[in-house]
Amino acid sequence: VKPHVVFATPGRLNDHLDKENFSTAAIATLVVDEFDKCLEFGFLDEMQAAVTRLPALKRLMLTSATDMESIPQFIRRCAVADRAGVRTVNFLGEAEAREERLEVKTVPAPQKDKLETLARLLSALRGEPAMVFVGYRESVERIRKYLVSEKFAAEAYHGGMEQDKRERALYKFRSGCCNVLVSTDLAARGLDIPEVRHIVHYHLPANEEAFIHRSGRTGRWDETGNVYIIVGPEEHVPEFIGEAAEWNVDGERINPVSPAWVTLYIGRGKKDKLNKVDILGFLCKKGGLTAKDVGRIDVADRFAYVAIAARKLNLLMKNIAGEKVKGMKTIIQPIKQ
């Protein structure tokens, strides 16, 4: 294999190197994203092993959203550092500029159980994408179940879920098929989710780092964003959050806004030589849709997800009943909440 770019965890990268799945002769750059988190998770030995096995390495870049107290000795002793030295490029100034684009508000909850306050807050956001951060997996499931019972389009995301269910939840949120993602801090790092307008801290962040990473899901690049901290009757806003205006949501509760898109499941994928163009063509020619009625399309090995304009779903399902996709019989059905 001659890849241009290899994405892997430290352990998986070493596995590739052990099996000689690709040549290391031309690998000049190694980027370790979330370097501080890799150390926290105990990947020090794996990272050290990978660095020492790349003889042509010219650039070693370590990225972290928070300032690092020290750089491990193996980095300072590696051949790249010996030749070029270690240099820190600090983008904290840009982070401060982003903070100016974030509006932080506290939302008082009259009861210890904040569910009703959360529902009122999300209703006031009128269907704009929102991520709700909580401290425990069990809380994610409980809150998501409550929100669904209150007619919100909400999905759960945490480390206890199977990978395919996590990926489906992310797809639905990214594509606009759901507008609320309830998650542990697992979603605070490493996910590219554009246009998240609102971050809700249902449970107070454990520390400043958690607050930064959670809140960093909004206000990205040149966008603006809103951060809400729900504060219970016995809670106090941590000092590291700084000044925040108070927003009371005790007024009349607004009915939740339903997403404009729904998720369609197609039981064929890349292994069946099905691609995005095939899917779009099928939906338009057989389903009677226009390109504007079709949103994000994700094609996996054995299946595909497609965002369909909710107002056109019934027409689509009627038109494609019994139809084949690229000559293949398959299951085509909307994914329920």
Feature map (PLM): residue ranges:
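Walker B catalytic acidic pair
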Residues: 10, 33-35, 136, 195, ...
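Conserved interdomain hinge at the start of the Helicase C-terminal
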Residues: 100-148, 288, 292
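Conserved helicase ATPase core of P-loop NTP-dependent helicases/translocases
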Residues: 140-146, 152-184
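A short beta-strand element within the Helicase C-terminal
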Residues: 180, 189-204, 226-230
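Non-catalytic terminal extensions of ATP-dependent helicases
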Residues: 250-337
